[in-house]
Amino acid sequence: MVGWKYSAPFDDLDAQAELGGYPIRNDNLANESKCGKTEHRVIDPGKDNLGSDIVVGGEGTGIVHMAPGCGDIDHKVGKKLNTVSIAPLDEESKFSNKFGWLSGKKATDKDTIDEIISYLKENEIADSLGQVKPSFNK
């Protein structure tokens, strides 16, 4: 599966079309016409600094979404693999502009979460949702 490309649920949001990433632009990636939309692909994130696999097949689904603009491990993997970084939230956990119908909404508010879940279901992106406790929260 490594190398497979795919489209993602929020590719219609303006931030995904920003060459080089958003809100911080990587000029090298921009010059290669790379943006969030063009960079969705299955990767092998490799190992952490202790030599352990970052994604383990026996935990959860064995498939993890990497978001280089969101979180330390994802950022490090994205930097290593030279991927576009999209950081959707400001310092108040609100979606910044260029995120369409989500702009200005607080990511942790129940109403925002419910809207996102409804969007995923209405667009047949998710039919059932549950929670998987990440291994880094053990």
Give the location of each predicted region:
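Protease-associated
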Residues: 1-63, 72, 76
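Residue patterns forming the tRNA-binding/recognition surfaces of aminoacyl-tRNA synthetases
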Residues: 48-138
